[in-house]
C-alpha cells in the first residue's frame, strides 16, 4: 500500500479507470458478438448491428482500449463474413 499522498490518489484513479475500461471493453465485445451472430444467421438487421460493432470498435481504438490495428483487423474480418 502506498504511503505517499499522490501514490494513494493514483491507486484510486487507476481503480476507477480500470472499472470504466472493463465495462467499455465488455460492451464492445457484446456488440461485436451480436453482429457476428446476426451475420451467421443472416438476420434482417445485420447491417445495423455491423454499423454498431464498427462504431464500438472505432471508439475503443480511439480511447486506447484496443490498438487501432486490432480494431481494423476485427472490422475487416467482420466485413468479410458479411
Curated annotation (Swiss-Prot):
Q: Which GO terms describe its cellular component?
A: cytosol; small ribosomal subunit
Any Gene Ontology biological process: translation
Molecular function (GO) terms for this protein are: small ribosomal subunit rRNA binding; structural constituent of ribosome
SUPFAM superfamilies the UniProt entry points to:
Ribosomal protein S20
Q: Which UniProt keywords apply?
A: Ribonucleoprotein, Ribosomal protein, RNA-binding, rRNA-binding
Q: Which cysteines are joined by disulfide bonds?
A: none
Q: What NCBIfam families has UniProt attached to this entry?
A: S20 (TIGR00029)
Q: What does this protein do?
A: Binds directly to 16S ribosomal RNA.
Family affiliation: Belongs to the bacterial ribosomal protein bS20 family.
Instruction: Provide the protein name.
Output: Small ribosomal subunit protein bS20
- This chain's source organism reads Lysinibacillus sphaericus (strain C3-41)
Q: Which gene encodes it?
A: rpsT
